[in-house]
Amino acid sequence: MATNRPSCGGAEFARERNIPLGELSLKQFASEEERDAAMRDFFQSHGVELVVDAGYDRIHTRPLLDAFQGRIVNVHPSLLPEFGGGMDAVEQALRSGVAKTGATVHLVTEDLDAGPILAQESVPVLKDDSVETLRRRIHEAEYRILPAAIRLLEARLAGRGVPANSSRRLRIRGV
């Protein structure tokens, strides 16, 4: 596991279970590219085949994107392409007055939140929703679709069933 936030819950989980942990705060490096090269090297040295961005709030650069092309998955708190490209997707959904938003799992590309979609689940926007209540329901959807999307991608990468270039995606609950 690699993190840019050593105090996050995932890092604690890894430490408790002796899972290799790369603590790669940007402060340690001269550039984002240097950080991503270190992340690439860390992952490759541990035989990582699939990178899952869960709670990772940085944009990847060429060293990591090139090494793991088609094998980096991100979770985004909206039904992409709506409200992509930033950290305030939940706030945007509430401001816009949409009836539903949701969660998306997609492949990471050099274009922010624009990679092929693997799975989506819609979440209704309730009239009395706050950012916190809507974000909590979106997180619950993310927890459901991320494992399913990872299994789909694993099957593609292993050559079982769904070709790697397939546009097939999982539609979960109302998308």
Give the location of each predicted region.
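Generic signal for short, ordered secondary-structure residues
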Residues: 21-22, 43, 72, 125
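Donor/substrate-binding cores of folate-linked one-carbon enzymes
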Residues: 50-172
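Short phosphate-binding loop-to-helix
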Residues: 27-59
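Anion (oxyanion) recognition and catalysis
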Residues: 15, 44, 94
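Short, surface-exposed acidic-centric catalytic microdomains
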Residues: 1-38
